[in-house]
């Protein structure tokens, strides 16, 4: 069951117990958000946003351990959201994995403070390895 917080933002009701790492999935494509969510193996709490403004608002509200952030979204690009996240002291420990379809944007995302950049398309097991890797680095 999914609980809507507002348009395009939801939390998985079965995973709201404390102690789980929160993964915020930010992408304007619902099918990709679902693919990421079902691909992640492990006990995670999920939240989703479908544009840059919602991504930033939900990050500030939930303070996720990991953000999976698409580069190209409406209402704010992934780079704009990433810049805001990196300037927000309350979110300084959030690991950010940037998704892009344009390999040439990798360097810019890393300069802006991304922990990892993944080029689309990717295999489902790659997203699990990426999330586990950035979480291990933060611990």
Where do the model's predicted regions map?
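Acidic catalytic/metal-coordinating carboxylates
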Residues: 51-54, 65, 77-83
């Amino acid at each position: 069951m999914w609980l809507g917080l507002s348009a395009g933002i939801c939390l998985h009701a079965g995973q709201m117990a404390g102690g789980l790492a929160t993964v915020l999935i930010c992408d304007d494509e619902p099918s990709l958000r679902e693919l990421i969510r079902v691909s992640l193996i492990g006990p995670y709490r999920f939240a989703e946003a479908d544009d840059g403004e919602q991504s930033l608002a939900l990050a500030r509200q939930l303070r996720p351990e990991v953000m999976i952030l698409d580069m190209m979204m409406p209402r704010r690009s992934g780079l704009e959201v990433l810049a805001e996240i990196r300037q927000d002291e309350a979110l300084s420990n959030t690991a950010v994995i940037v998704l892009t379809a344009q390999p040439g944007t990798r360097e810019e995302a890393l300069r802006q403070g991304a922990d990892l950049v993944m080029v689309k398309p990717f295999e489902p097991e790659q997203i699990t390895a990426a999330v586990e890797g950035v979480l291990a680095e933060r611990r």
